[in-house]
A protein has these predicted regions:
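N-terminal loops that bind phosphate or other acidic moieties
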Residues: 2-119, 123-345
């Protein structure tokens, strides 16, 4: 029986490599052989995971993140493409500052260095307006230019293009197919994990729709915030693709191709998918959902929390539960031992 173990990070608790080491040790203690693959869709920790698949660092640059803290950012050379992970600067774990007081402006400092930008795992919910404010769009409150943070959205009365504006030619890796606005919008789906309550979600969503209309008045071809994938990284994908002209690409599919995993996924009888939380959004562009779609063998879920109504998509489900947030290693070992009992029957 050929077994594959795939792991993304367990955000806030365990890295993909830490998960794999725990599972590997438990399997080896029970004489179970398997192949192990850290995986990513271009979001949080994607640089680390790409490197574990042999991708090399091209150079390191110093850039200030969304709260002004200087970070060392690795630029990876992926088949000649220079890749940068956006969550290194705007990541959900970078700061506890209220997300309504944050935006994506800092990313303007890495644009010129990159060919491919990975989105996902962001702390921001600004529709990418912060980045646009540094790339040739001015946001006005009356006659005064204003910083387009969500806390200022209601004040924005007009948007104008200035001489700095130009289109870009870059690949943007998205970790979700969810749109910025419309049914199941990015702010609605991912806002709660970034600290937004229902009132804030509603206010930000309405203002994003209003401001995208203001932006649209500057273009003959109207930007579309309902397009698939535009919701990635709090709408940063919308700004990069619909305004700046970049190409959205599935981060998972890009990873499968560049890591060589594409040709291996269906060579296993059993696949074990490890993720911190599996829910409906996991099937809307996340790497685990993409593996599940491709895999023709038996699949098991091993992870933190399973929060999806259909449990039949896996042969069985092994969760750490809420206790996994407090003692992640201990609970993952316990869940893995239960999985071992299942696959050795």
């Amino acid at each position: 029986m050929n077994i594959a173990v795939y792991s993304d990070k367990f955000s806030g608790t365990l890295s993909a490599s830490e998960v794999i080491e725990i599972v590997k040790e438990t399997f080896q203690n029970n004489s179970i052989k398997a192949s192990y693959f850290p995986v990513t869709d271009g979001g949080e920790d994607s640089s680390t995971i790409f490197k574990e698949h042999g991708i090399e660092v091209q150079e390191t640059i110093n850039v200030k993140d969304l709260v002004g803290i200087e970070k060392q950012i690795e630029l990876l050379n992926i088949s000649g493409d220079i890749f940068v992970e956006s969550s290194l600067l705007i990541g959900i774990n970078n700061t506890n500052v209220d997300t309504t007081d944050l935006n994506t402006a800092c990313l303007s400092e890495i644009i010129e260095f990159s060919d491919v930008i990975g989105l996902g795992g962001s702390r921001t919910n600004d529709g990418g307006f912060g980045l646009l404010s540094k790339m040739g769009l001015d946001f006005f409150a009356g006659k005064e230019i204003i910083d387009p943070k969500p806390c200022n959205f209601e004040k924005i009365t007009s948007v104008e293009i200035n001489d700095k504006f130009e289109k870009l030619n870059k690949k943007i890796l998205v970790d979700t197919f969810i749109p910025l606005v419309g049914k199941r919008s990015a702010i609605e789906v991912f806002g709660p994990q970034k600290g937004l309550d229902k009132e804030s979600i509603n206010n930000i969503s309405l203002n994003i729709e209003r401001i995208t209309d203001l932006i649209s008045s500057n273009f003959k071809e109207k930007p579309d915030a309902t397009k698939k994938g535009t919701g990635a990284a709090g709408g940063l994908a919308f700004a990069l693709s619909e305004i700046l002209g970049c190409n959205l690409v599935s981060g998972a599919e890009y990873f499968f191709d560049k890591s060589g995993l594409e040709s291996k996924i269906n060579s296993f009888d059993v696949s074990i998918l490890c993720e911190g939380k599996f829910d409906k959004s996991s099937l809307e562009g996340k790497v685990m959902g993409q593996i599940l779609n491709k895999n023709k063998g038996i699949s098991y879920f091993l992870g933190g929390v399973y929060d999806y109504e259909d449990r039949e998509i896996f042969k069985d489900i092994f969760e750490c539960g809420e206790a996994g947030l407090v003692e992640p290693k201990k609970e993952l070992i316990s869940a893995t031992k239960k999985l071992v009992n299942q696959i050795t029957i």
